Swiss-Prot record:
PANTHER family: REPLICATIVE DNA HELICASE, REPLICATIVE DNA HELICASE DNAB
Taxonomy of the source species: Bacteria, Pseudomonadati, Pseudomonadota, Gammaproteobacteria, Enterobacterales
Single Gene Ontology MF annotation: DNA helicase activity
Chain sites annotated for binding ATP: 223-230
Protein name: Replicative DNA helicase DnaB
Organism whose genome encodes this protein: Buchnera aphidicola subsp. Baizongia pistaciae (strain Bp)
EC number: 5.6.2.3
Function noted in UniProt: The main replicative DNA helicase, it participates in initiation and elongation during chromosome replication. Travels ahead of the DNA replisome, separating dsDNA into templates for DNA synthesis. A processive ATP-dependent 5'-3' DNA helicase it has DNA-dependent ATPase activity.
Reaction catalysed by this enzyme: Couples ATP hydrolysis with the unwinding of duplex DNA at the replication fork by translocating in the 5'-3' direction. This creates two antiparallel DNA single strands (ssDNA). The leading ssDNA polymer is the template for DNA polymerase III holoenzyme which synthesizes a continuous strand; ATP + H2O = ADP + phosphate + H(+)
Similarity comment: family membership: Belongs to the helicase family. DnaB subfamily.
Protein keywords: ATP-binding, DNA replication, DNA-binding, Helicase, Hydrolase, Isomerase, Nucleotide-binding, Primosome
């Protein structure tokens, strides 16, 4: 009984509190559009009919869109005639209200500012509406766990954020783009050229091919099992974390954080992994490990999320959170792409991978940082004589090939040919580079250190 009373009271309070709106701004937009039809293209980029608080204003805006799509002008006569033919004129206050709208416009020059006001109020109303749904789901979870409720809340809030991001994007004038491009060129001109315009990978030959990892790029690293794709990606992350101030964020869906740290200590300390795993360390090993730990604790610029199950929305929200808290990121790495799940698309792996790929590319563009995503390869390449991977070997390759700016494959001949002359050598095959050449570079693979190094015949060690 108490719950019923509380619910009724909540409903009464909700009715007393008017949702945020600006009827004056809505009226000024509609009146301004009747006076200046050319403003439609600017306004329709910012708001839609659902952004209006007044149902009458939604109806008028929808009718304006209909008339303009038909090639008709919108004014008092055409608008009232069209509404009357559909029997809707009386719902909006008839001709008199339309006349009042066009008469009371402060200025058509400020119409885009009015649209910003209407959109802002609309966004707040959407947040309130979603908050109420989350509260309702909390009172009546219908079997949902607390984690499922959190995922629901997160996805709904993120959907609003995405809508807002899309409204802020759109065509840019060539003058604006030229200004941005020229500023970038001047920045590069005034910076001593070292063959790198993006993020330094730590690998000289790879930098020469790619000019570094570029902002907003989606980078796919793919290989068959045991080739070292996690090691290679982690080495890039380590190199960047040691060089740049802004942190690196790692999503490790396959390995635990402790396993990642064990590999990192082996790699950076040059201490054999087997020694670390068994604890059979000598004084020199301990000295190296201690030195590495001190450096890592001093830098403190790497985050590892080892959640074994993540959705695109969870990954996106966690990335944004770390980005905001640190005023930026240098890089995001995902190990590996096929382990991410899209609940609404489970059962259709092709569509699921396409959605994951789209999200990662969108996030890279939004945060303006490179994102590395590891991917599996199809088993079918094992049937070929030459087992060096190509783009079509990517699992669910269509969307990955399309969205990726850079695709790199790892091939180590020693895994297929025991007596090869290429022992300890890894080929990094660039299968796609949107703004650069494709080709192959060599790196030295020191597996016992969990490390790829710049290629040199003298650098390989099997100790």
């Amino acid at each position: 009984m108490k719950n019923v009373k509380k619910k009724n009271l909540d409903n009464q309070v909700e009715k007393l509190i008017e949702l945020p709106n600006s009827l004056e701004a809505e009226q000024s937009i509609l009146g301004g559009l009747m006076l200046d039809n050319e403003q439609w293209d600017y306004i329709s980029e910012k708001i839609s009919e659902n952004d209006f608080f007044s149902l009458s204003h939604q109806l008028i805006f929808r009718e304006m869109k209909y008339l303009l799509n038909k090639g008709y002008p919108i004014d008092l006569i055409t608008l009232s005639e069209s509404l009357e033919q559909k029997g809707k004129l009386e719902y909006i206050g008839r001709f008199a209200y339309l006349a009042e709208l066009s008469k009371n416009v402060p200025s058509t020059a400020n119409i885009t500012t009015y649209a910003d006001i209407v959109r802002e109020r609309s966004m707040v109303r959407k947040i309130i509406k979603i908050a109420n749904k989350i509260i309702q789901a909390g009172y009546d979870p219908r079997g949902k766990t607390s984690q499922e409720l959190l995922n629901l809340a997160e996805s709904k809030i993120l959907s609003i954020s995405e809508q807002n991001f899309q409204k802020n994007s759109g065509p840019k004038n060539i003058e604006e783009l030229l200004d941005i491009t020229l500023a970038n060129i001047e920045k590069l001109f005034n910076t001593p050229y070292k063959g790198i315009t993006g993020i330094n990978t730590g690998y000289q030959d790879l930098n020469n091919k790619t000019s570094g990892l570029q902002p907003s790029d989606l980078i796919i690293i793919a290989a068959r099992p045991s080739m070292g794709k996690t090691t290679f990606a982690m080495n890039i992350c380590e190199n960047i974390a040691m060089t740049y101030k802004k942190p690196v964020l790692i999503f490790s869906l396959e390995m635990s954080g402790e396993q990642i740290m064990m590999r990192m200590l082996s790699s950076l300390s040059r201490v054999n992994q087997e020694k670390l795993r068994t604890g059979q360390l000598n004084d020199e090993d301990w000295a190296r490990i201690s030195s590495t730990i001190n450096i890592l604790l001093k830098k403190k610029n790497m985050y590892i999320d080892d959640s074994s199950t993540l959705t695109p929305s969870e990954m996106r929200s966690r990335s944004r959170k770390i980005y905001r808290e640190n005023n930026g990121l240098s890089l995001i790495m995902v190990d590996y792409l096929q382990l991410i799940k899209v609940p609404s698309l489970i059962g259709n792996r092709t569509l699921e991978i396409a959605e994951i790929s789209r999200m990662l590319k969108s996030l890279a563009k939004e945060l303006k940082i490179p994102i590395i995503a590891l991917s599996q390869l199809n088993r079918s390449l094992e049937q070929r004589r030459d087992k060096r991977p190509i783009n079509s070997d990517l699992r669910e390759s269509g969307s990955l090939e399309q969205d990726a700016d850079l695709i790199m494959f790892i091939y180590r001949d020693e895994l297929y040919h025991e007596h090869t002359d290429l022992k300890g050598i890894a080929e990094i095959i660039i299968g796609k580079q949107r703004n650069g050449p494709i080709g192959t570079i060599k790196l030295t693979f020191n597996g016992h250190w969990s490390r790829f190094d710049n290629y040199s015949e003298s650098k390989y060690s099997d100790e």
